[in-house]
Amino acid sequence: MNKQNIIPIAIASSLAIVGTGVSFCVHKMKKYKNTEIKLPEGFTITAHTGCMDTKENSLESIKAGVENGADIVEFDLYFTKDGEPVLSHNAPKGKEVTLEEAFEYVSQIENIKVNVDVKTVDALEKVYPLAIKYNVADRIFYTGVKDEFVEAVKKDSPEIEYYLNVGVEKSKKTDEKYLLSIVEKVKNSGAVGINFNYKSASKELVDIFHENGLLVSIWTVNNEYNMYKILKLAPDNITTRKPDKLSKIIK
């Protein structure tokens, strides 16, 4: 067979494979779309910082979340060298929005809650007084709380509820014994629930946590197929960069 014949055959084979893959994905999407979605009472959509292609940890991001169907807006919390709380995922460089500015902005928006994603706990005791100052103390909670942050959170922010961030092993996401060990870990930490990556989500996990009175928050779900897939599991919260898409699905 000469090269002139090989190339068209190779292209045709590749297109056939791609076509099969697309057909399979469309079929799975239809299956999830046709499945009835039953969400727990109080289900929420969290707009991840930087949602709707805005700048992360900006007031614009908060505004975009509010305007596109989110019940909760999320931003990252870091502290400057002198202990000022600011919105940043990494060590501050001096141009960040301050936590005070964010709380003041949120205080002007009714019914929106705030997910404060803790990146460091250096001066955590400064958060609650600012929340009181701007009358948003009953609207904030922490995520990003790793094992090593728990004691600092309890000591310096005892008034603020938090989710424990847990790296759930994908290979064990349906293993009852393993899942119960995570339940015990979350309970012992004092957290209200678990916050974890959608790739490790399972119906078994959600059900076991709910049976034990704990909340389930799943991040970060951005495409429509995964939204349907995770909604079917009935968690308490889904975090997304596309709150507009998710809110349209559940309406």
Residues covered by each model-derived region:
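Phosphate-group recognition and catalysis centered on beta-loop-alpha active-site segments
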Residues: 2-251
